[in-house]
């Protein structure tokens, strides 16, 4: 329970949630008194309203761009759209409940509202981290194992992501832990404090299944991706203009994915730290002010991903500029200046085999998402002088779009 000066938000929480040990109750008992001053509630409402509007606008824009422009419809972008859909739903449902409560100086919803707020927040948060994990794995099997990813694979992955997230978010609805009012009194979350074996086991497995394992998979995948790119750059026979472009593309894509993961962790880390404190019996250190700040950081993650897409993916940037010209400025670039939908190619595996009198043969596989380069050693095929680099003989380079 919270104790201390409720009007100023000073005091502490014992980690059991504002609802106490009895779980969610009718609205009147969930938040018996305001935890912040009226001015603080107004500022919180302004911040949450801004986060909600930006989250809805930015993520809705990503969905519109994906729908309108054929060039954006790739399996990788479909995974990015899944994150945007999750963030859009967070902005519509999760932020709205807290925003209205700020306007009313406290939680105004009943038990069902509390359960829905906790369930939706958990569901969409797990969807985001699970999609980032699948995105890392997708890059891993394309780059390291040189396998092609199609839409069927992407749709199956998204289906499993939502089923996996529903299982974890729905467990408290079936009696494995529960959703209670958070310490700041403006939203609901899992009961982190409970020492009951049933509740504690859920918290333990939730940390493992939705934090430790995903981060481990992400670290493993990107470690191998960076190693593969580094090995490819060390092979002198592949230092052609085309391959250099591929390396730049992959490096940029790796930076984008890393930035998305880094942003997610930065936004959610304060909340995760608070949960660890509560689980380990240090809930008295968590004040309502600290709790609401961590909540704002977590919800702000819904705003950043679309900005990352636009700034780091040229296809999104071109599509956005074209949409603005067509819809807002009423000026359309000449057709010859606009890239035709589907005209851009995707990079697939590079398989390289070299011949050099005294050196052993090397085989390098590399995968990307824009063009397929296959460098083979078929003696029946001829090769241009431009395909020979550094005194080595490369028999043929085949390039074909996906």
Curated annotation (Swiss-Prot):
Residue(s) carrying N6-(retinylidene)lysine: 299
Single GO MF annotation: photoreceptor activity
Entries under InterPro entries matching the protein: GPCR_opsins, GPCR_Rhodpsn, GPCR_Rhodpsn_7TM, Retinal_BS
An example Gene Ontology CC term for this record: cytoplasm
One Pfam family per UniProt: 7tm_1
Entry's induction text: Induced by low-level blue light (453nm) during epithelial wound healing. Induced by ultraviolet A light in dermal fibroblasts.
Membrane topology: Multi-pass membrane protein
Residues anchoring lipid (S-palmitoyl cysteine): 325
UniProt-annotated glycosylation sites, renumbered to this chain: 5, 198
Residues that span the membrane, as ranges: 41-65, 78-102, 118-137, 154-177, 202-229, 256-279, 288-312
Tissue: Expressed in tracheal airway smooth muscle (at protein level). Expressed throughout the epidermis and dermis, predominantly in the basal layer on the facial and abdominal skin (at protein level). Expressed in dermal fibroblasts (at protein level). Expressed in melanocytes (at protein level). Expressed in keratinocytes. Expressed in the retina.
Residue pairs linked by disulfide bridges in the UniProt entry: 114-188
Side Cytoplasmic, residues: 66-77, 138-153, 230-255, 313-402
Single GO biological process annotation from the record: positive regulation of D-glucose import
Compartmental location: Cell membrane; Cytoplasm
Keywords, comma-separated and alphabetical: Cell membrane, Chromophore, Cytoplasm, Disulfide bond, G-protein coupled receptor, Glycoprotein, Lipoprotein, Membrane, Palmitate, Photoreceptor protein, Receptor, Retinal protein, Sensory transduction, Transducer, Transmembrane, Transmembrane helix
Segments in the Extracellular topological domain: 1-40, 103-117, 178-201, 280-287
Family (UniProt): Belongs to the G-protein coupled receptor 1 family. Opsin subfamily.
PANTHER family assigned: OPSIN (PTHR24240)
Subunit structure: Interacts with MC1R; the interaction results in a decrease in MC1R-mediated cAMP signaling and ultimately a decrease in melanin production in melanocytes.
Chain's role: G-protein coupled receptor which selectively activates G proteins via ultraviolet A (UVA) light-mediated activation in the skin. Binds both 11-cis retinal and all-trans retinal. Regulates melanogenesis in melanocytes via inhibition of alpha-MSH-induced MC1R-mediated cAMP signaling, modulation of calcium flux, regulation of CAMK2 phosphorylation, and subsequently phosphorylation of CREB, p38, ERK and MITF in response to blue light. Plays a role in melanocyte survival through regulation of intracellular calcium levels and subsequent BCL2/RAF1 signaling.
Protein name: Opsin-3
Species for this entry: Homo sapiens (Human)
Gene name tied to this protein: OPN3
């Amino acid at each position: 329970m919270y104790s201390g000066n409720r009007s100023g938000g000073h005091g502490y929480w014992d980690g059991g949630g504002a609802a106490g040990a009895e779980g969610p109750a009718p609205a009147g008992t969930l938040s018996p008194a305001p935890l912040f001053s009226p001015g603080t509630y107004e500022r919180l409402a302004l911040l949450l309203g801004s986060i909600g509007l930006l989250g809805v606008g930015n993520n809705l824009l990503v969905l519109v761009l994906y729908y309108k422009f054929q060039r954006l419809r790739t399996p990788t972008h479909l995974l990015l759209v899944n994150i945007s859909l999750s963030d859009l739903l967070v902005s519509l449902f999760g932020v709205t409940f807290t925003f209205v409560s700020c306007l009313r100086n406290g939680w105004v919803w009943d038990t069902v509202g509390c359960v829905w707020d906790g369930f939706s927040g958990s569901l969409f948060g797990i969807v985001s981290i699970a999609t980032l994990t699948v995105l890392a794995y997708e890059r891993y099997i394309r780059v390291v194992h040189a396998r092609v990813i199609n839409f069927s694979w992407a749709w199956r992955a998204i289906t499993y992501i939502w089923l996996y997230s529903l299982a974890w978010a729905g467990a408290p609805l079936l009696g494995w832990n529960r959703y209670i009012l958070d310490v700041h009194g403006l939203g609901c979350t899992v009961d982190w404090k409970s020492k009951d074996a049933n509740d504690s086991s859920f918290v333990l497995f939730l940390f493992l299944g939705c934090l430790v394992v995903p981060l481990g998979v992400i670290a493993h995948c990107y470690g191998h991706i960076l190693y593969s790119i580094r090995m490819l750059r060390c092979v002198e026979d592949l230092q052609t203009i085309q391959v250099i472009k591929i390396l730049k593309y992959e490096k940029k894509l790796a930076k984008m994915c890393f930035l998305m993961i880094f942003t997610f962790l930065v936004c959610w880390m304060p909340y995760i730290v608070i949960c660890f404190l509560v689980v380990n019996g240090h809930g008295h250190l968590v004040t309502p002010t600290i709790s609401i700040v961590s909540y704002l950081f977590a919800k702000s993650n819904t705003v950043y991903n679309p900005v990352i897409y636009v700034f780091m993916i040229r296809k999104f940037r071109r599509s956005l500029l074209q949409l603005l010209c067509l819809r807002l400025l009423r000026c359309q670039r000449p057709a010859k200046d606009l890239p035709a939908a589907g005209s851009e190619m995707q990079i697939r595996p590079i398989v390289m085999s070299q011949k050099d009198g005294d050196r052993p043969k090397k085989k390098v596989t590399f995968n990307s998402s824009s063009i397929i380069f296959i460098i083979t050693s078929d003696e029946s095929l001829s090769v241009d002088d431009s395909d020979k680099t550094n005194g080595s003989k490369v028999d043929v380079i085949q390039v074909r779009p996906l």
